[in-house]
Amino acid sequence: MDQTIQYFNSEEAARILNVNVSSIKRWTEDGTLECVKTVGGHRKFTMQHLAKFLEEHKTKTTRANLFPIESEEDLEINTRILKADFAFLIDYVSDQSRQCHRDRVHRVFNGLYLAQHPLHEIYDQLVTPVLQRNGDLWEQGQITIVEEHFSTQTIRDCLIRLQGIIQIPSEKIGTAFCLIMSQELHDVAIKMVDHILELKGYQILFSGQMTPSMKIEKIFELYHPDRVYISSTIVTDVNLTQAEFDKICYIAQAHGARVFVGGQGFNQIDFSHPAVEKRLGTFEEVYLS
């Protein structure tokens, strides 16, 4: 088995799904619940297996334990997830992410997704407020820049892990090019845009930070994106960023691609180019775009 993947045994899967072990055995034997078997014949389950089961068999488990229960604290977190208590979860994830507790943050993200919360809701109601919270705490001098960076990178890593349990449509509905400007250092938001669009069925072209050597024209010639998503959080060089943005819009327009923008950086950038379809303010708007 892949040692980089988290596996649960039958007892742990039963606790998560809030059923007895005999139900787990029955469901695996009749093919309702997928699993992998070790050389010794033991059943092992991944979050993908449990997520697929919950999505396809909602009536079989009415109150799943969405956060693996190992302590009283775990029970509390599970209850907060079931109640969608985002105010509590923002505090919890903010604190855990600053301490680089990836496993704790990852479990909250997984739990919310297993509870059938849309990805854009998790991003709007939890991830974005946590990032803003820690940014504000740093500006106020209540945490160090290192702690703020710890939080951001922990969240980024956990978002990538979360994407691993999501079922992506095999049939593609278009191609989306996601990027940030050359002076932009914040790529978490555009990564969340990437994940939402992939969930919708788009083939994703993710370049991250634009560089001077990047031939934008070649990307359009080779991959033919029909949408471009650009995120900007902080603009340090307005003239350079404006020039880069205008160039992208010009090329996108020439190839018939629509441009979507988002982030506070666009308060400083003129985005009135005719290629721009809309400025997006939430991840729900990304999903609906």
Give names to the regions the model predicted:
Residues 10, 30-31:
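Extended non-core architectural segments that shape protein topology and connectivity
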Residues 1, 14-15, 99, 184, ...:
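Residue-level marker of alpha-helix boundaries and capping positions
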Residues 141-144, 150-289:
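C-terminal regulatory/effector modules of DNA-binding transcriptional regulators
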Residues 1-23:
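Polyanion-binding surface elements
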Residues 7, 20-21, 105, 190, ...:
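Generic non-transmembrane alpha-helix signal with a bias for helix starts/N-cap capping motifs
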Residues 27:
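Residues in the recognition helix of alpha-helical DNA-binding motifs
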Residues 16, 21-23, 32-167:
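Long amphipathic alpha-helical segments
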